[in-house]
UniProtKB/Swiss-Prot annotation:
The species this protein was found in: Pseudomonas fluorescens (strain SBW25)
Family according to the record: Belongs to the XseA family.
Compartments (UniProt record): Cytoplasm
Pfam families referenced in this protein's UniProt entry, alphabetically: Exonuc_VII_L (PF02601), tRNA_anti_2 (PF13742)
Catalytic activity: Exonucleolytic cleavage in either 5'- to 3'- or 3'- to 5'-direction to yield nucleoside 5'-phosphates
Domain of life: Bacteria
Designated gene of the protein: xseA
Swiss-Prot/TrEMBL GO biological process terms: DNA catabolic process
Protein name per the record: Exodeoxyribonuclease 7 large subunit
C-alpha cells in the first residue's frame, strides 16, 4: 500500500506549471483507475462526423464526461440515446487542455431498466411487423357477458378489487379464477397454460390482470411466449397489467387494454342502474311508438269508413257520372262535326279556285296578251338590231383599209402577199403587187430610197 501516493510524482516543494500539474494528474488517474465499471444514465449524447461518441454519464448527485472512440463505438450493439441507463467500463483520464477529467470507455452495456427497455422495444417492433397489434385482429367485447374468466394471482388486492366491482355492478355474472404466478421467470409458463385453459373453457370474455410494480416486476407480461398466447386466444381478452402509466406487450396484443384491473372489470360489468335506465328509456320509446301507431291506424280507419258508402249512393254516383260523360260526348261530337264542316267549306273554296275552266280562261287571256305584245316586241327588237348594225358598219368603214385605198392610197405586197411597210423590205428589180381602191397593178422596184419621205395630207 502506498502511504503517500504523491511521493512517486516528485512534488517535494517543486513549483509546477499548470501544464505540468495537469499532466502529472492525468498519469496518476490513469494509473489508479485503469479498468473500472460505472453505472449511470446517458445525457447530452453527441455523435460528430469523426465517428466518436461523447456523452455525460450522470446519477442523481453527480456527472462525469465520457468518450467512446470510433473503434470501440462500432462494437456497441444497442442504440445509445439520452435517458438510457447503462454500465460502462474504461479508465479515468484527464483532458490536460481544460483540466477536466473524463472516462475513456471501451465497453457500454445496458443496465437495469435500460436493458429491459431495449428488449421491450425490440419485441414490440418485431410483433408489430408481424401484425399482432393490428386493429383487424381485435375482437369486440360482449355487451352482456354471463361467464368471465380471470387470469391472475389468487392472493392480493387485484382479485379482490375485480370481484368487488362485479358484485356492485353485475352480481349475476359468473366469475372463474384461473390462478397463476404473475412475477418472476416461473410466471411465464404458468400464464401461458392459464390462457390456453381459459380459452378452452368457453368463457364470454377473459381478464389478464396484475397490480402495479417496477418494469422488472411486470416483465413476464413482456415476454414473447405470453404475447403469442394472448394473440392465440379466440375469446375476447382484456389486458389490465400494472397502473395506468404502465404499458406491457400484452396490452398491445390483447383485444382491449384497461388502465387498471378495476377498470377492466367495469368494462365487462354493465352497471345495473344503467341497464335499468336503458330499459326505462326503451319502455318509454315503445309506449310512444305504440301510441303513434294507434293514432295512425285510427286516422286510416276513419278515412276508409268515409270512403265506404251505401250501394245505392254508389249507383247514383255512377249514373251521374254516366250523364256527365254523355253530355261531354255529345259536345265533343258537335265540335268535331263543326270542325269537319268548316274544313269542307275551305276545301270547296280551294277546289273552285283550281277548276280547269277557270285555269283555261286565265291561260287564254295570257295567250292573247302575249299575241298582242309579240309583233310589237319583234318590231322594236328588229329596229334596235338595225341601228346597232348601222353603227357597227360605220365603225368598220372608218377602220377598214379599203376606205384608205379609196382616198388614193395603195398597198404594196411582196411575192408572199406580205405588206411592204418600209423600203428596207425591198430590193432593186423586185416585182411587187400594188393594190388600189379599185383593182391592182404589177410594179417593179427600180430603186429603194431609205430616207423618210414626208407626205402632204392636203392633197
Amino acid at each position: 500500500m502506498i502511504k503517500d501516493p504523491f511521493a512517486r510524482l516528485g512534488l517535494d516543494r517543486e513549483i509546477l506549471t499548470v501544464s505540468q500539474l495537469n499532466g502529472r494528474a492525468r498519469v496518476l488517474l490513469e494509473d489508479v483507475f485503469t479498468n473500472i465499471w460505472v453505472e449511470g444514465e446517458i445525457s447530452n449524447l453527441a455523435r460528430p462526423a469523426s465517428g466518436h461518441v461523447y456523452f455525460t454519464l450522470k446519477d442523481s448527485g453527480a456527472q462525469v464526461r465520457c468518450a467512446l472512440f470510433r473503434n470501440n463505438a462500432a462494437r456497441v450493439r444497442q442504440a445509445l440515446k439520452d435517458g438510457l441507463a447503462v454500465k460502462v467500463r474504461g479508465k479515468v483520464s484527464l483532458f490536460e487542455g481544460r483540466g477536466d477529467y473524463q472516462l475513456i470507455l471501451d465497453t457500454v452495456e445496458p443496465a437495469g431498466d435500460g436493458a429491459l427497455r431495449l428488449a421491450f422495444d425490440a419485441l414490440k417492433e418485431k410483433l408489430s411487423a408481424e401484425g399482432l397489434f393490428s386493429a383487424e385482429r381485435k375482437v369486440p367485447l360482449p355487451a352482456h357477458p354471463r361467464r368471465i374468466g380471470i387470469i391472475s394471482s389468487p392472493t392480493g388486492a387485484v382479485i379482490r378489487d375485480i370481484i368487488s366491482v362485479f358484485r356492485r355492478r353485475a352480481p349475476n355474472i359468473e366469475l372463474t379464477l384461473i390462478p397463476t404466478a404473475v412475477q418472476g421467470r416461473e410466471a411465464i409458463p404458468q400464464i401461458v397454460r392459464a390462457l390456453k385453459l381459459a380459452d378452452a373453457r368457453g368463457f364470454d370474455a377473459l381478464i389478464l390482470a396484475r397490480g402495479g410494480g417496477s418494469l422488472e416486476d411486470l416483465w413476464c407480461f413482456n415476454e414473447e411466449a405470453v404475447a403469442r398466447a394472448v394473440d392465440a386466444c379466440i375469446t375476447p381478452i382484456v389486458s389490465a397489467v400494472g397502473h395506468e402509466t404502465d404499458v406491457s406487450i400484452s396490452d398491445f396484443v390483447a383485444d382491449v387494454r384497461a388502465p387498471t384491473p378495476s377498470a377492466a372489470a367495469e368494462l365487462l360489468a354493465p352497471d345495473a342502474s344503467h341497464l335499468v335506465r336503458q330499459v326505462e328509456n326503451l319502455h318509454r320509446r315503445l309506449v310512444m311508438l305504440m301510441r303513434n301507431r294507434l293514432s295512425h291506424d285510427r286516422l286510416r280507419l276513419e278515412g276508409m269508413a268515409r270512403r265506404l258508402r251505401h250501394p245505392g249512393e254508389r249507383l247514383r254516383q255512377q249514373a251521374q257520372r254516366l250523364d256527365d260523360l254523355d253530355m261531354r260526348l255529345r259536345r265533343a261530337f258537335e265540335r268535331s262535326l263543326n270542325t269537319r264542316r268548316e274544313r269542307l267549306i275551305r276545301l270547296e273554296t280551294r277546289l273552285a279556285g283550281q277548276h280547269p275552266g277557270r285555269q283555261l280562261a286565265l291561260l287564254r287571256q295570257r295567250l292573247e296578251s302575249l299575241a298582242e305584245r309579240l309583233p310589237r316586241a319583234m318590231r322594236e327588237g328588229l329596229k334596235a338590231r338595225r341601228l346597232q348594225l348601222q353603227s357597227q358598219v360605220q365603225t368598220l368603214h372608218v377602220v377598214s383599209p379599203l376606205a384608205t385605198l379609196g382616198r388614193g392610197y395603195s398597198i404594196l405586197l411582196d411575192e408572199r402577199g406580205q405588206a411592204i411597210r418600209t423600203a428596207a423590205q425591198t430590193h432593186t428589180g423586185q416585182r411587187l403587187t400594188a393594190r388600189l381602191g379599185e383593182g391592182q397593178l404589177q410594179v417593179r422596184v427600180e430603186d429603194n430610197h431609205l430616207t423618210p419621205v414626208t407626205l402632204s395630207l392636203l392633197d
